[in-house]
Structure formats: C-alpha cells, structure tokens
Design a protein with these regions (language model features):
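Basic, polyanion-binding surface patches
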Residues: 2-182
Length: 182
C-alpha cells in the first residue's frame, strides 16, 4: 500500500481550556503503580495505562516528565500496576497526593502483599495486577512514557475506578445499545 504524504498545515489556534475540556471526555481506568522492595517502596497514581503490544506483552504508562516513579522503576528494573476497583478512590487519592509520606510510610494502613518477583506492593482489592519488568522510558512532550514487559497478570471481578471529566467514578459498565445495521 502506498500512501501520499499530507502537506503540513499551519496549526489551528484554539483556546487551551477548550482542548482541556475535550480531553476530560477520555474516560480511563485508574491504577496505582508500585515499586519496591520495602525499604525503597514507592507508589503513584496513574490514569493512563494501556496495552502497547501483545507479543511481547507490553503495557505503557504515561507519567509526568521527571517522575520519580519512572526513575525508581528503571533503577529497580521492575514494577507493578494495580488496577483499582470502584471502591478504591481513597487509594487513588492517597497516591496522587504529593504531600504523602515517602517510602513504606505511604502504604501504612493499606492491605498489600509484596510480589515475589518485583518485590513491589500488590494492593488488596485491586481488579487486576500486572507485574512488569522495566522495558524502557521515553520522553513524550511534557510527559514520560514508561513501558513494562508483563511477566505475570492476575484479575478479579468487580467494577473499575474510572477517571472522567476530572473526577473519579465507580464504573457502571452498561453494554452499549445495539442498533440494526442499515
């Protein structure tokens, strides 16, 4: 297949607030990323986690540029992704709070177990856990894309915690209405 190059057009001027409002309509599951071991534990909330490749199985996480999590995950060589359930908004807020304590103190009072491979906390009640080997990190504008090679994944039943229009929602997943093909 041959594709012709599209001429580059001048950027359209648009109010940044309007673009931001439009982006708020991208609903996404909320996860807490963790790395360990216990003496170097760290967690952070992320709402942009996606499948990048099925073979090899790679997931991507978008973080703020200069994120300490990306640096720590690279140094440890492994990390975990905890996909939060609809009743775990408090966990998401805890790890999104920049004034939270460092290290294991940020996990105080939270039920978790250390993964035997990653030594990272797997948060109890999460809908899914992806244990990853660090693959790479890439600068992407004002963000950083962290890629992980999934070495183990587990899933449970329940509704997801979703980020939508700037808020957190306990996901109510209704099947879309089907219409007859015309």
């Amino acid at each position: 297949m041959t594709t012709a190059a599209t001429p580059v057009r001048r950027a359209v001027r648009q109010d940044p607030a309007e673009r931001r409002r439009a982006l708020y309509h991208l609903a996404s599951p909320v996860s807490v990323l963790t790395t360990g071991p216990e003496e170097r534990m760290h967690g952070t909330t992320a709402s942009t986690v996606t499948l990048v490749s099925r073979s090899p199985l790679l997931v991507g996480v978008v973080l703020r540029a200069g994120s300490s999590f990306a640096r720590l995950a690279a140094a440890e060589g492994r990390f975990a992704i905890n996909v939060l359930g609809g009743e775990q908004a408090d966990v998401a807020r805890r790890f999104a709070d920049s004034s939270r304590p460092d290290g294991s103190a940020s996990f105080a009072g939270l039920a978790w177990t250390a993964d035997r491979y990653a030594q990272a906390p797997l948060i109890a009640g999460a809908l899914a856990h992806y244990v990853c080997r660090f693959h790479s990190a890439h600068a992407a504008g004002d963000s950083e894309l962290l890629l992980g090679h999934v070495v183990r994944a587990t899933a449970d039943e329940g509704l997801p915690l979703l980020s939508y229009t700037g808020g957190l929602f306990a996901g109510s997943l209704r099947p879309a209405k089907e219409t007859a093909a015309s």
